């Protein structure tokens, strides 16, 4: 069976080059549990045959945008893989019996005629059921939004055509045009109910194809992030009152403020009918109220500032949820707040047996309030149970012991403004497993906006691990490298292992938290010269590995070249940042011109740019390069 690779939505298709996995000396991740297997067996009915299909897609006549997107993705990929364009029919006009040949997407009239029980399947917000009933296949997600149906479509394509999405511009599948429809009995709930990795590569299509859901896209702008003060100030009721500190932080003990805040929050909900997520975060980088009422309230409930905030939310959300349940029972409205600066420590105490109990019944978070744990000082060079992170992790466990739902706001640390990658290669798999065990249902990572190493690899690998925490980080990374770099995979695996080993053996010298000063990152202690030189040497080896493609397959050559350069850019920039003072003027000029000329250096003026290409960072660094040449 031939294996094909889809390089971009522009539909440049080339034959994939199969390569053996290079043996690498490393400690493998050890899965901590086994997962039950779903049942997918061979069917007898043809799905696609000689460019045609008897199957039609059925969607509701009132389908949400997510169902429309799922339908478009199914049509798109089947047409590209099997040269067969599927037709769509509304559920109002789909005559249904056991012999019908339909692919039903989401909840619709056909689905309601089945015995499929989504509640019993318990698939969460991003899980799905793929179920054969007769010749018809039902792909259905649950939750207020239909992302599960989208993800179910990708899983259907994986089972049917062997399709795997490594990146928006790297999708593999089995090149078979005549395929029989499998018989499905699949119920899938990802280990992390929802996750999202922020960054330059996570446009809607790219993120969705990797299984991400960005819950901030469901938010009303007035109730997103650090929103409490803004919500209170929507009306003038606060004027002349002592409800705010001098720094505009709410005074949570001001009980007369509670109904005013609830009224304003209800107004936001009314005015934003498409929003379902409402973040209720206190002001950023501002101390908590220390008035006499707050001090007295803490003493009364034997609690801390976070406890006062929970008391405030409990009163407000009792009012708001009674309103939303009556007026918007089907909107799936949810609320969350940050466990962050000033309210980071949970309102709990030891139970004497290694666990935690709430400071009082009054501080137990409202059952509709999600706690988004937001630790600024987590060090990604260490696992959560190691000394640098242990206190933070205990705080997470404390929150998880009292909250109905816990979420995680992570940081891709210093990479938002540098070309230095974070060291999650050795720790992410442990982190996501511990978060799963703690009951974490959402993982959000504030990520890179510029050109660090391994952006696309991390998006793929970490997305896979969020869905299935039993996977090995290394094995998943090697699989990505194999397909993403083709003939250069051997060199790129060594490049990946270089980083893993270096970060593991030098972690005590390496800054791992998001507030690390830039001067500490671009340092001889952190970025040793031999480490940078070895990076560039391995990337030159990767370039040599694709040289034959210049004449054999020009488009494949340009694709692989650009992907290698996306790794070479930070390597060369980091070397200039730290060691330019010891370079000759000639060497500096050579290095700068090499980088500056990359966008135009391909012969015949041809150019290939991957979505969100980090080579665009050349513009950001142009002033820096100019100053170096002076």
Q: How would you label these PLM feature ranges?
A:
Residues 335-375, 419-424, 452-459:
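Substrate-binding cleft/loops of secretory-pathway carbohydrate-active enzymes
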Residues 54, 65, 70-73, 77-79, ...:
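Feature activates predominantly on carbohydrate-active enzymes
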Residues 465-630:
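Catalytic domains of carbohydrate-active enzymes that cleave complex glycans
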Residues 22-25:
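C-terminal motif of bacterial Sec signal peptides marking the signal peptidase cleavage site
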């Amino acid at each position: 069976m031939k294996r094909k690779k889809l390089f971009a939505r522009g539909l440049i298709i080339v034959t994939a080059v199969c390569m053996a996995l290079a043996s690498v000396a490393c400690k493998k991740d050890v899965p901590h549990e086994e997962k039950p297997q779903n049942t997918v067996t061979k069917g007898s009915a043809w799905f696609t045959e000689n460019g045609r299909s008897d199957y039609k897609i059925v969607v509701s006549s009132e389908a949400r945008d997510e169902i429309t997107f799922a339908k478009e993705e199914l049509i798109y990929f089947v047409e590209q893989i099997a040269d067969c364009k599927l037709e769509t029919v509304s559920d109002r006009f789909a005559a249904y019996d056991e012999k019908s040949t339909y692919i039903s997407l989401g909840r619709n009239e056909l689905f309601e005629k089945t015995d499929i029980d989504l509640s019993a399947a318990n698939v969460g917000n991003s899980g799905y059921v793929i179920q054969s009933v007769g010749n018809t296949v039902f792909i259905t997600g649950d939750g207020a939004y239909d992302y599960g149906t989208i993800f179910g479509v990708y899983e259907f394509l994986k089972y049917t055509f062997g399709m795997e999405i490594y990146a928006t511009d790297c999708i593999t599948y089995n090149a078979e045009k005549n395929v029989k429809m499998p018989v499905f009995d699949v119920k899938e709930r990802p280990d992390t109910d929802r996750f999202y990795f922020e960054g330059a590569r996570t446009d809607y299509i790219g993120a969705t194809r990797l299984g991400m859901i960005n819950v901030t896209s469901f938010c009303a702008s007035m109730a997103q992030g650090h929103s409490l003060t803004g919500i209170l100030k929507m009306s003038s009721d606060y004027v002349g009152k002592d409800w705010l500190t001098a720094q505009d932080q709410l005074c949570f003990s001001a009980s007369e403020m509670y109904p005013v805040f609830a009224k304003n929050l209800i107004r936001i909900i009314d005015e934003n009918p498409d929003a379902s997520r409402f973040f209720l975060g206190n002001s950023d980088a501002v101390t908590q109220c220390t008035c006499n009422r707050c001090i007295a309230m803490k003493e009364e409930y034997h609690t801390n500032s976070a406890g006062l905030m929970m008391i405030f939310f409990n009163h407000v959300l009792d009012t708001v949820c009674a309103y939303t349940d009556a007026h918007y029972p089907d909107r799936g409205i949810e609320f969350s707040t940050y466990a962050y600066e000033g309210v980071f420590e949970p309102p709990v105490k030891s139970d004497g047996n290694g666990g935690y109990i709430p400071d009082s019944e009054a501080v137990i978070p409202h059952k509709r309030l999600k706690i988004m744990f937001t630790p600024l000082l987590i060090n990604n060079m260490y696992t959560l149970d190691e000394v640098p992170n242990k206190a933070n992790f205990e705080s997470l466990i404390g929150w998880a012991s009292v909250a109905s739902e816990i979420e995680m706001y992570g940081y891709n640390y210093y990479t938002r403004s540098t070309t230095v990658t974070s060291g999650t290669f050795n720790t992410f798999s442990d982190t996501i497993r511990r978060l799963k065990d703690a009951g974490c249902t959402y993982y959000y990572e504030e990520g890179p906006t510029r050109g660090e190493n391994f952006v696309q690899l991390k998006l793929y690998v970490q997305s896979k691990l969020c869905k299935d925490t039993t996977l090995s980080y290394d094995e998943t990374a090697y699989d990505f490298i194999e397909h993403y770099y083709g003939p250069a995979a051997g060199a790129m695996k060594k490049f990946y292992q270089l980083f893993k080993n270096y970060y593991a053996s030098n972690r005590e010298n390496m800054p791992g938290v998001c507030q690390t000063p830039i001067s500490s990152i671009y340092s001889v202690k952190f970025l040793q010269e031999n480490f940078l030189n070895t990076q560039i040497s391995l990337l030159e080896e990767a370039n040599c590995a694709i040289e034959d493609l210049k004449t054999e397959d020009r488009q494949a050559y340009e694709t692989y070249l650009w992907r290698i350069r996306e790794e070479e850019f930070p390597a060369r920039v980091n070397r200039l940042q730290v060691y330019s003072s010891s370079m000759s003027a000639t060497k500096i000029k050579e290095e700068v011109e090499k980088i500056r000329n990359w966008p135009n250096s391909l012969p015949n003026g041809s150019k290939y740019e991957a979505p969100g290409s980090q080579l665009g960072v050349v513009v950001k660094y142009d002033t820096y390069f100019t100053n170096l040449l002076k």
